[in-house]
Amino acid sequence: MKQVDTITVTELHEMASKMYGNLVKVDVDVAKETVIVDMEMHADGEAYLLENGSKQEDLWGINLHPDNFGSDDFIEFDSMINLKPRQGNTSRDVLDTDIHAKIVEIVNRVVTQ
């Protein structure tokens, strides 16, 4: 697990091959625009971010599929840490369109070819 400011698709492929084969788990702090990659569970990255000053309501889990870079299937919004009933997010997806868009914006800035 590591915090990244930028990461290449090649690095994501390497991470995916060592853990899940076709995906890399990622946590995003939408307020601080912090990105944590390469953990076994989203909860691991969530714990790290909370220990380092992030707020629970700002943390969202996604999966990146390096083989699908450049397509709509690159980012998968599916994580247990996304279940936030008090924020109206009753799904493993990210239902708030503004938060969803912010995550896409952050990922598009951080991940390079």
Report each predicted region and the residues it spans.
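Well-ordered alpha/beta subsegment
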Residues: 92-113
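Amphipathic, interaction-prone secondary-structure segments
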Residues: 40-74
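Conserved, charge-rich beta-strand/loop surface module that forms ligand/interface-binding patches
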Residues: 1-8, 80-84
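Short histidine-centered catalytic/ligand-binding loop motif
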Residues: 8-16, 85-96
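Generic structural hydrophobic/aromatic packing signal, biased to beta-strands
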Residues: 23-30, 75-77, 103, 107
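Negatively charged, low-complexity tracts enriched in Asp/Glu with abundant Ser/Thr
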Residues: 5-48
